[in-house]
A protein has these predicted regions:
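Extended alpha-helical heptad-repeat/coiled-coil "stalk" and oligomerization rods
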Residues: 1-72
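Charged, low-complexity interaction regions
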Residues: 19, 122-126, 268
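Charged alpha-helical initiation segments
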Residues: 52-132, 152, 165
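Mature extracytoplasmic or organellar-lumen-exposed domains after removal of signal/transit peptides
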Residues: 129-132, 136, 157-160, 166
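Nuclease catalytic cores
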Residues: 131, 138-146
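Short, solvent-exposed secondary-structure capping/transition elements
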Residues: 145-154, 158, 269
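Flexible secondary-structure boundary motifs
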Residues: 161-244
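Charge-enriched, short contiguous segments at helix-coil
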Residues: 218, 223-293
């Protein structure tokens, strides 16, 4: 009997030691990851200081930071646990329902990775920088909006008003005149979360005239009615949806993406709030996918 107890005790000790070793390895990996993030934040902060008076430059710097950080996180071996990924996907599928399959594959990967990273960081008692969690979720949001507000919108305009012949009829968010007065398409990489309020017409650039803005609104309404949203919405409901998207995206961009570029600006509470807002409670991204065609 005593031998069985001793064997059981030894087996339990080995299991606890294995768990402890795994947690130690995970903490070490997270610390290395945090170090990489901090160096990227320091580099970004120095660039932001240089371009402090240039809003376009600031947006470009913040977008570059988001891209680099997301790429670094997706490459981390820490986030490849099959069990954690499977559980994260189950939760996300429950949240999105049938719309989970309508998300782009890159968006699904961003969301799964964000949830796994959050769970891994919660298991470590130290106060950590949760910037990566927010950036990954926001990259998923950006991927869905980029496809619809830039790619699909551009294709819609090209179909109805070919750029080569009717560029003047395009909305200002998709085209501009160069220094020689020639019409040019806006480069695809110029689309960022920071540009979404302009695409939704909740913000209008100062240089856009009232007449040009009216044309922008006509183009946007036509696209939203025929392509962007599910069929049968009234014009009032379409504008209500566009306004909500523009304002919600501006909110998360300022509160989470922009702050994530600074060291220790995003802690556990902020990351939890971001996840709640986009996925778990207010479900902004879940709502968008229901409204999109």
């Amino acid at each position: 009997m005593n031998q069985k107890v001793d064997d059981l005790h030894e087996d339990m000790t080995e299991r606890f030691d294995a768990v402890d070793d795994a947690l130690t390895d995970m903490q070490s990996t997270l610390e290395n990851l945090t170090g990489d993030i901090r160096r990227l934040q320091q580099e970004t902060e120095s660039y932001l200081a240089v371009g402090a008076d240039d809003a376009a430059a600031q947006e470009k710097i913040l977008e570059s930071f988001s891209d680099k950080l997301a790429a670094r996180l997706l490459d981390s071996s820490l986030l490849r646990s099959h069990d954690l990924c499977e559980r994260a996907q189950e939760i996300l599928q429950e949240r999105f329902g049938r719309d989970w399959g309508r998300l782009r594959s890159t968006s699904r990967r961003f969301l799964i990775t964000a949830r796994v990273l959050f769970a891994q960081m919660e298991a470590v008692p130290d106060q950590m920088d949760y910037s990566g969690v927010c950036i990954l979720m926001l990259k998923a949001l950006e991927a869905e909006l980029h496809q619809r507000l830039f790619c699909d919108y551009s294709a819609f305009m090209e179909k109805h008003h070919p750029f080569a012949a009717e560029a003047a009829r395009w909305p200002s968010v998709l085209c501009y005149r160069d220094n020689r007065g020639r019409w040019r398409r806006v480069a695809e990489e110029r689309f960022t979360l920071g540009s979404v309020p302009y695409f939704c017409n909740t913000r209008v650039p100062e240089h856009i005239s009232d007449a040009a803005n009216e044309q922008d609104r006509r183009c946007l309404l036509s696209f939203a009615k025929q392509k962007l949203f599910r069929k049968g919405l009234s014009e009032d409901k379409i504008w209500e949806n566009l306004t909500r998207i523009g304002k919600d995206v501006e909110r998360v961009t300022k509160r989470y993406r922009n702050r994530a570029a600074h060291i220790n600006a995003i802690r556990h509470q902020e990351a939890r709030e971001c996840m709640d807002f986009l996925i778990d409670v207010q479900q902004v991204l879940v709502w968008m996918m229901r409204e999109f065609a």
